Amino acid sequence: MLRILLIDDTPRKIGRLKSALIEAGFEVIDESGLTIDLPERVEAIRPDVVLIDTDSPGRDVLEQVVLVSRDQPRPIVMFTDDSDPDAMRQAIRAGVSAYIVEGIQAQRLKPILDVAMARFESDQAIRAQLQAREQQLAERKRIELAKGM
């Protein structure tokens, strides 16, 4: 069972979303508004997935997503009413694994979270490969530099 940290910008919506998650068989281990220190909360409770529900992802939220993605990588799913392509791009660049526009339905939650998990795992594998290649290149440069001396 996936353990979910639920972040929402309105208490009214948090209740609906929490109910839908529980109905879909997920465990909501913590819930909060958008004004928290997200990296600190993620470190403290170690959720499997962070789910953010917001009318429109603001700069502060995206900055916190960047910090979580960099320091404590895990799938982040964002439900929003903002269908602006620039907002989508910014969220994906920040580290959001799935950006879902217009509505949350209990029957859609499991497939959405499954896709987010798969995308996150794929992204992590690509990042690991890139890091390994960068290390190999740095080692080759050191060897070539040593040969030239």
Enumerate the predicted regions with their spans.
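Conserved acidic segment of CheY-like receiver
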Residues: 1-13, 17-21, 50
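Conserved phosphotransfer microenvironments
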Residues: 14, 34-39, 48-68
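Receiver (REC) domain switch/output surface
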Residues: 20, 109-121
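Short hydrophobic/Thr-rich beta-strand motif most characteristic of the beta2 strand and flanking loop
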Residues: 25-34
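A short, hydrophobic beta-strand element within the central beta-sheet of small alpha/beta folds
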Residues: 73-83
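C-terminal output helix
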Residues: 86, 104-113
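C-terminal output/effector regions of signal-responsive regulators
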Residues: 128-149
